[in-house]
Amino acid sequence: MAADMQRKRSSECPDGTLTPSDGHSVERAESPTPGLAQGMEPGAGQEGAMFVHARSYEDLTESEDGAASGDSPKEGARGPPPLPADMRQISQDFSELSTQLTGVARDLQEEMLPGSSEDWLDPPGAVGRPATEPPREGTAEGDEEDATEAWRLHQKHVFVLSEAGKPVYSRYGSEEALSSTMGVMVALVSFLEADKNAIRSIHADGYKVVFVRRSPLVLVAVARTRQSAQELAQELLYIYYQILSLLTGAQLSHIFQQKQNYDLRRLLSGSERITDNLLQLMARDPSFLMGAARCLPLAAAVRDTVSASLQQARARSLVFSILLARNQLVALVRRKDQFLHPIDLHLLFNLISSSSSFREGEAWTPVCLPKFNAAGFFHAHISYLEPDTDLCLLFVSTDREDFFAVSDCRRRFQERLRKRGAHLALREALRTPYYSVAQVGIPDLRHFLYKSKSSGLFTSPEIEAPYTSEEEQERLLGLYQYLHSRAHNASRPLKTIYYTGPNENLLAWVTGAFELYMCYSPLGTKASAVSAIHKLMRWIRKEEDRLFILTPLTY
């Protein structure tokens, strides 16, 4: 398997300065611990690798054409060709699109009227979904207005359409009701490409509109969030890879070569819950932001026993054996010289968490790992060790006829766990799947994210008060996204950032070896935050064999 090649990014350039657009204070700072040598950071002691070697966010988000989608142009690089004289027409078209996004009620009502074109009718089991409940008798008009108002209030919308303009997926509302909006989007893309230009993002009226084209699909995000265009593009790539995981790239290309206006919803019928779940995970799980996997906190001896049991319970067709719990990695064993990409692992996590049916027995399902091989299917054996636990066992096989051999691997794995006493230790670990930030012993520290780039793993404590509600948790992740986008700005990256807000202060520190994001009380000072870094890094180092997989095994 070809691994992603590491590139020397513009992050080696001197730090730039960015002016806050939200009224909060953001400062650059010198390296908090200049004496920390690369290779000595927590997590760097991993013996061997589990994932595709990618040490930077840019490596993980690099697209197949060699450029990170949504990147801003590098300083000193030649700019894009002059825009066509018809740019006024493009602006006018976007104004119409913006009008639809902020005043979509009329369009939705017209599209939902009887007598709409049959080209946009749902096939059996289509993925279209109403934005809200159906209107009640006697109040249809008022309820339709409420539904469209609720649609407009969402902070982020995601649309997928074919290059021919056929709707494939929309995060909210039905695809038919939004067909005119999607038509404007594909018209903008096609208009610019006719002049050998490519549209990547538009910023207007408080919105970011980000386009990612992966022929034969066009993916669009419309957001009013703190995320950068680059991060929104990465989320769209996840959606694209999610579609590939269900169809394979070869099948997708073949379909549209045969019929350019094919309605892809016929093949994706019923899969919208998987895509919905992926978007929900990206809104609250920092794994996607960090481009890494989080491990279940576990004693090193227990984890080594689990890994050895997975290694010994193998079949000739197996490529990966994975034990996970609540989207946290417990153990991963891979075939020698075969490496999993974090994006593929996230897609597997999403597949499992999107359906409760996997708890009912042993499942055998085809799955494409698009970053490993987008051309074909593997077959995944998915089962929970016990119905009442969150321990899920995943075997990835190359042989679709090997179900019974792989099922026997599951039986042998469970036997070894019980004989070695690891089964009870795992159940005990699941009682506290997250550790408390209070264990670090830093009074003002509320939360943190720490990623070891060499291992592809990150760690973070449980999100606790004052971030107890779902809204507050998403707001905290939004702050991390804000710092992350500034640290990874393609034209002027920042290595250290200090952020002060009304409810919390944050500090970001990004190096070639690790990334650290800290959230602490607004009463804390910058000096105390820098001082806390030393203590936090020492604590993570002391606990690294519990928080990271340091001895990964192979077949």
UniProtKB/Swiss-Prot annotation:
InterPro entries: FUZ/MON1/HPS1_longin_1, FUZ/MON1/HPS1_longin_2, FUZ/MON1/HPS1_longin_3, Mon1. Residues 1-12 have a biased composition (Basic and acidic residues). The modification Phosphothreonine is found at T61. The modification Phosphoserine is found at S31, S56, S91. Residues 1-87, 114-147 are annotated as: Disordered. One of its GO terms (cellular component) is Mon1-Ccz1 complex. Keywords: Guanine-nucleotide releasing factor, Phosphoprotein. One of its GO terms (molecular function) is guanyl-nucleotide exchange factor activity. Signal peptide: none annotated. GO terms for biological process: protein secretion; protein targeting to vacuole; vesicle-mediated transport. Belongs to the MON1/SAND family. Plays an important role in membrane trafficking through the secretory apparatus. Not involved in endocytic trafficking to lysosomes. Acts in concert with CCZ1, as a guanine exchange factor (GEF) for RAB7, promotes the exchange of GDP to GTP, converting it from an inactive GDP-bound form into an active GTP-bound form. Interacts with CCZ1. Found in a complex with RMC1, CCZ1, MON1A and MON1B. The MON1A-CCZ1B complex interacts with RIMOC1. The MON1A-CCZ1B complex interacts with RAB7A and this interaction is enhanced in the presence of RIMOC1. This is Vacuolar fusion protein MON1 homolog A.
